[in-house]
Design a protein with these regions (language model features):
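Flexible, compositionally biased loop and terminal segments
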Residues: 1-257
């Protein structure tokens, strides 16, 4: 960009930021971080798509900062699905190590402690490696008393399986006599979801141009507003983040009515 273009861009971004942050923001934003591999191939011209995953992890650090700045109380990100285990072993190992390193980093991050961000993994812990489990427990233990912001990282996560697990828990409660079958409600199922501590997402954002939900928070996003952008996750800019929030602010949420 030239000097004039840069100045115009900065002016527009500052104006947009002021507009967005002076209006009510979503309480809970969920993000499907998509496009890392295509970014590596098409933007970095790299044969090793893991470079795209590294850039994606770096972008997540930025987006967490943006959410704190905007006072968005809950951020949930789709880091690794149960289906991702079917990818090439080398890529799976790289991704899980990336998440492991991130968890240890979050546990020691001054920004996390200064802003009192609670870190939590949502997903099936029984199928992740022990070293990743230890890293998750480290971050969670270090932040368990915080409640200003919640940062949920979905790992080994599948929306359908989450619902099945919740139904099993409720069914067991009925079987044990702790609950009557007539007491089964949406709330009783929601209380058995991984995200039971948080409100449902107000805004679900997906990058890379794909128009699908990919088994992510399918119970919780029943009334969420959806926002899709063609931009690959590592290329996602602050101005794109602001545009997504503005789009949410301009909608009339009807909650199915």
């Amino acid at each position: 960009m030239g000097i004039v273009t840069n100045t115009a861009y900065s002016t527009y971004q500052n104006k947009l930021e002021k507009e967005v942050l002076s209006s009510p923001v979503p309480n809970h934003v969920a993000i499907i971080m998509d496009g890392n591999r295509r970014y590596a191939r098409e933007v970095l011209k790299a044969s090793d798509t893991n470079q795209g995953h590294q850039k994606g992890k770096d972008k997540l650090e930025e987006v967490l900062n943006w959410c704190i700045k905007a006072d968005i109380k809950v951020l949930t990100v789709y880091a690794f699905s149960t289906e991702n285990f079917s990818r090439e072993e080398e890529e799976v190992d790289f991704l899980l190590k990336l998440i492991k390193d991130m968890m240890y980093s979050l546990g020691d991050d001054d920004r996390i402690h200064r802003n009192k961000v609670r870190v939590k993994m949502i997903g099936d812990r029984s199928i992740i490696p022990d070293d990743l489990k230890e890293a998750v427990e480290y971050a969670e233990k270090k932040t368990e008393d915080y409640d200003n912001y919640h940062f949920n990282v979905a790992v080994a996560y599948g929306g359908r399986q989450e619902i099945i697990n919740a139904v099993k828990n409720v069914a067991q409660a009925v079987k044990d006599g702790r609950m009557d079958v007539d007491d089964i409600t949406e709330e009783s199922l929601s209380c058995n979801m991984y995200t039971s501590d948080d409100p449902d997402p107000d805004l679900v954002l997906r990058t890379s141009g794909e128009l699908r939900l990919s088994n992510f928070l399918i119970w919780q996003m029943a009334y969420s507003e959806l926002y899709f952008t063609d931009i690959y996750w590592p290329s996602f800019r602050y101005i794109d983040f602001l545009r997504a929030i503005r789009a949410y602010q301009q909608r009339n949420r009807r909650y199915g009515t």
